[in-house]
Amino acid sequence: MPREIKDIKDFLIKARRKDAKSVKIKKNPENVKFKVRCSRFLYTLVITDKEKAEKLKQSLPPGLQVKEVK
């Protein structure tokens, strides 16, 4: 089941949960989508600022599998 998250801090909390398996990063010309797969939901965060997206990518937990999709 998909869920959309509007807040970056809320997304980071979801990404640090122990049931979070992986993060997919989808880059489009106008935005960047971060999708974290947890046991029940797929949480999506849409960011239009490229600099914020790079900072968020750096602050993801190190044990999480990160996959970039174009």
Swiss-Prot record:
Cite the InterPro entries for this sequence.
Answer: Ribosomal_eL38 (IPR002675), Ribosomal_eL38_sf (IPR038464)
GO MF terms here are: structural constituent of ribosome
Q: Which UniProt keywords apply?
A: Ribonucleoprotein, Ribosomal protein
Superkingdom, taxonomy of origin: Eukaryota
What are the record's GO terms for cellular component? cytosolic large ribosomal subunit
Offer one example of a GO biological process linked to this entry. translation
Q: Mind telling me which Gene3D superfamilies this protein's record contains?
A: 3.30.720.90
A Pfam cross-reference name:
Ribosomal_L38e
Query: Its family?
Result: Belongs to the eukaryotic ribosomal protein eL38 family.
User: How is this protein named in the record?
Assistant: Large ribosomal subunit protein eL38
